[in-house]
């Protein structure tokens, strides 16, 4: 009854915001049928069109644009992924896929076939299988060598790397390597069931720092969650980073991404409470908290980018309990207006991608409770 009351109150607040929507975001259904936690997009087939890879029911599927032909590229009982990434792992010029399972921890990379991505199964290889509680993965060049690495958390308080987080360095020959090279940047100092990661140079020293959030709540036996934090990189990125806890107690904290919100040249932080309520941003360097939205329940995914093409950073989410897809318009100074994209879509994962090649950022959503994969077409540059 309490959740129902919250949802009804929220509906009244968000209906007012809905009147300010700039155009109608056309909904494109790619696939329906099962619970989806992850969807990524890239031109996997090399034809200039953006394709999609998602995972549901232990099957990893490639959907080929523009008609979204379904190709099973992986079918394995162990491949129930909660998050994923895509980049060229093996350096052969095409995009590969990375899937992460929560528990027991497992990260698998799928090698795209060189000749025909849509021909059938892709070769799957293990990148990591010793960290436990992998809720988020993120590509980033951590050591500054010009090659992408992979960030991942080890959220569970057990195993070899309890309450920790790592970055994985791709081996010189990932096709032959038994596992990727693991570096622990958060060593036993990320308790409370951490979720998703972010990366950026927060202190302006030229090194890549890492952000992380922990939800806390009833399932957190340590009682040490409900925080947002960043880890400062040292001269040697293979050594543990220095943790900086950000202000406030944040029940349900999940997502945290560096971005210059107010245009002052410093990276601020945008964050959401995906197992709680609301979105905020922290102003660098004081880390003063500013509200983005105080009403939205369960904004369990977050992306940042210039959605309306006005030169500043906006944000987007899709809430899995309140089933609201929304974007947040920045006025350039850190004051945000909520716009509802759709009022019956649930997600754990959202991506900002130009799906149709028209030069603006659309939203790709892996429908968790809504059991679908959809993308919403950005109308802001339509005639």
Where are these regions (language model features)?
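Beta-propeller-forming repeat regions
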Residues: 16-383
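Bacterial N-terminal signal peptides
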Residues: 5-15
């Amino acid at each position: 009854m309490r959740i129902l009351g919250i949802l009804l109150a929220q509906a009244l607040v968000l209906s007012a915001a809905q009147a300010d929507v700039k155009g109608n975001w056309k909904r494109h259904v790619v696939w329906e049928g099962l619970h989806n936690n992850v969807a990524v997009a890239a031109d996997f087939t090399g034809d200039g069109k953006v394709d999609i890879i998602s995972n549901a029911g232990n099957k990893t599927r490639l959907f080929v644009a523009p008609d979204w032909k379904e190709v099973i590229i992986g079918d394995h009982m162990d491949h129930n992924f909660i998050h994923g990434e895509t980049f060229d792992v093996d350096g052969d010029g095409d995009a590969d896929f990375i899937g992460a399972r929560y528990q027991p921890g497992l990260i698998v990379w799928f090698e795209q076939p060189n000749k025909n991505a849509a021909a059938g199964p892709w070769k799957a290889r293990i990148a990591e299988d010793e960290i436990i509680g992998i809720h988020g993965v993120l590509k980033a060049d951590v050591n500054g060598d010009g090659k992408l690495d992979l960030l991942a958390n080890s959220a569970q308080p057990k195993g070899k790397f309890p309450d920790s987080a790592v970055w994985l360095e791709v081996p010189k020959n990932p096709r032959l390597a038994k596992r990727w090279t693991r570096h622990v940047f958060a060593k036993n100092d990320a308790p409370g069931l951490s979720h998703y990661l972010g990366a950026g140079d927060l202190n302006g020293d030229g090194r890549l720092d890492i952000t992380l959030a922990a939800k806390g709540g009833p399932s957190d036996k340590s009682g040490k969650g409900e925080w947002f934090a960043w880890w400062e990189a040292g001269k040697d990125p293979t050594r543990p980073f220095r943790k900086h806890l950000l202000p406030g107690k944040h029940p349900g904290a999940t997502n945290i991404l560096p971005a210059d919100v107010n245009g002052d040249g410093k990276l601020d932080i945008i964050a959401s409470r995906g197992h709680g309520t609301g979105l905020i941003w922290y102003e660098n360097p004081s880390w003063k908290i500013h509200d983005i939205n105080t009403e939205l329940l369960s904004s369990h995914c977050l992306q940042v980018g210039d959605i309306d093409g006005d030169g500043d950073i906006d944000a987007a989410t899709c809430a899995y309990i309140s089933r609201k897809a929304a974007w947040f318009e920045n006025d350039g100074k850190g004051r945000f207006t909520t716009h509802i994209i759709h009022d019956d879509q649930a997600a754990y994962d959202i991506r900002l991608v130009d799906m149709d090649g028209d030069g603006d950022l659309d939203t790709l959503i892996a429908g968790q409770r809504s059991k679908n994969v959809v993308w919403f077409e950005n109308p802001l540059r339509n005639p």
